[in-house]
Amino acid sequence: MLTHKTCQARKKMQVSFVIRDAEEKQHRNGVNALQLDANNGKLYSAGRDAIIRVWNTRTDSSEKYIQSMEHHNDWVNDIVLCCNGRNLISASCDTTVKVWNAQKGFCMSTLRTHRDYVQALAYAKDREQVASAGLDKAIFLWDVNTLTALTASNNTVTTSSLTGSKDSIYSLAMNPSGTVIVSGSTENILRIWDPRTCMRSMKLRGHTENVRCLVVSPDGNQVVSGSSDGTIKVWNLGQQRCVQTIHVHKEGVWSLLMSENFQYIVSGSRDRNIIVTEMRNPSNKTLVCEEQAPVLSLGYNIDKTGVWATTWNSDIRCWKLPMYDRCTMNSSGGMDAQWTQGGTEVACIKGGAAIKECAVLNDKRYIITKDSQDQVVVYDVLRVVKKEQLGAVDYEAEVKKRNKQVYIPNWFTVDLKTGMPTIVLGQEEVDCFSAWVSIEAGLPECVDPTTEIKINYGKLLLEALLEYWTPPHSIPPNEMEPDMHGNGYFQVPKHTPVIFSEVGGRTVCRLLVRDAAGDSESTLLHETAPQWVTDVVIEKNIPKFLKIPFFLQPHPQMTKPERTKKDRLVANEFIQCRKVCEHVLEKVLNAETTPSGGNANNSLQNSQSDANSEGSQLPAEERIELWCNDVVVDPNMDLRTVRHFIWKQSTDLTFQYKTKQNFNYDGSIGDSLERVTRKY
């Protein structure tokens, strides 16, 4: 027996998992941020598929993948390299900031200070200080050396906060010496703080929409901002005003890079264009390239002759930057540069396809998806695997073809935000224990023809996901009883990520199926797993059956109009209509369901006995016909399927029964029917 910690104030929890390959070498969605370690040529990319990947940009090979860094479970919005490339800090929509060993690729610690999506990070290299900000309007300052020293026992960290923001923060920047920090938000203004004192020094107005990207000059005197209003603005902090507005894009500016001398701007936009502009002379500009989708992030290559770009798509491309042949002084005192040809794609890190559409089949075990490359795939939710790759076929036609006329309650939801199928189990709008099915229908590959077992999809799946969890402080099993782990029918892939999170909120715990056996993971599960999970996984409790009330009455052909009184019955919703036929035959009509025996006294009695014996050997569904809404019901249908597809009303389901034409009752049976009808 396990004593599980309970708390009345604990928030409602859900469990989710991702159906994926053991190693996902390609991004499966857009890439939000880039960081290059120029010392070794490693490029770090933060994906909307919740994975940070590391690439070798020094190789000419198409295989640039080095490793994946996995511990987030939602979009990774920003990353910064620190400590000379030894560590990496990441910010995510899962509301966490994580500290990584950049060389070995593992998560060292998780910071849960933010209460909403963490959108942006800023880094002061000279002070080894990082700032984080997000949709909770909060900005926190972190000492990197303290973060990288955190351990399981030394896990307390203090942070300074910068207050005053009145709306969601989408951009953040610091200068290397850490004397200035700037934030941009949906207030459409820039707020400036001194991170040394945590005091706000000014706010700057001028943009008319969200401020999406920021760069601070090394001396802390200038700020360049890009906004959803399509403009780039240059701000002088000493004068506390905008000194220049640059119009080179037709849509929002989402990413900015500055040259080392802070004279040239490389900008990426929602209009898909990447443009180089001279800051003092904005008319001196050139188009680097037009990407295939809105540009999310930019980063220089090692020698700064090119720029890496990411978009809504999963590819990462490096484009050659135009060079300057010669410069001449123009009438305004600026330099007119003669641009060489740029825009050549010099490298490409290919991404994978993101799932864009999903249909849950009526059997509530399989889903069919369509991705950004029009590939259609069938997934087995129960076994957590890809079942069938159908190729570029007609998606709607496949869904229609594979949908059976069966109704099973929804017991999971599907989230496609990361580009991979994430299955969510909970107890709120969709009850993960609502799907009871016969083992013959739900697991035909495990059928024992001698049994009529009913299985619960949600229970089986949770038992498989947490098969390796052995709770701490649990009483050892009786030696005479087997130590039951898993569900006894199947296992799920051991690499499957399992996430425990608050409903509509923060992530509490993430682990792989195979890691649940670890001491720390087991303890964490004990502390965070909701009671409804431990009830079925640890306590082995059986989820309750859902019942359906229904009426049963003779068909008009079976009795006189005044003898149509209805019986009101209640049964488990998953029982098949053949069971209702048996009830009618045995309890209502009082007919024999086994061959009758005994001696006959004359030839008439013998013939009647033979006829009854022959008829009683037939299954009930071959002797009784059920009708609903003037439709003959398939005896293999269950009650919930009849209610959903045939009855289609909010009132109680109603059946009418009658005997089949090839099976006739004698007068005595008719008398029995009349008596039973009166009785009921």
UniProtKB/Swiss-Prot annotation:
It holds the Pfam family WD40. GO terms for biological process: double-strand break repair via homologous recombination. It comes from the Eukaryota. The keyword Repeat applies. WD repeats lie at residues 26-65, 71-110, 113-152, 164-203, 206-245, 248-287, 290-329, 350-389. Keywords: Repeat, Ubl conjugation pathway, WD repeat. CDD domains: Ubl_WDR48, WD40. Residues 592-616 are annotated as: Disordered. GO terms for molecular function: ubiquitin binding. Regulatory component of the Usp12-46 deubiquitylase complex. activates deubiquitination by increasing the catalytic turnover without increasing the affinity of deubiquitinating enzymes for the substrate. The complex deubiquitylates the wg/wingless-signaling receptor arr/arrow, which stabilizes the receptor and increases its concentration at the cell surface; this enhances the sensitivity of cells to wg/wingless-signal stimulation. Catalytic component of the Usp12-46 deubiquitylase complex consisting of Usp12-46, Wdr20 and Uaf1; regulatory subunit that, together wtih Wdr20, stabilizes Usp12-46. The Usp12-46 deubiquitylase complex associates with arr/arrow; the interaction leads to deubiquitination and stabilization of arr/arrow. Belongs to the WD repeat WDR48 family. This is WD repeat-containing protein 48 homolog. It comes from Drosophila yakuba (Fruit fly). The gene is Uaf1.
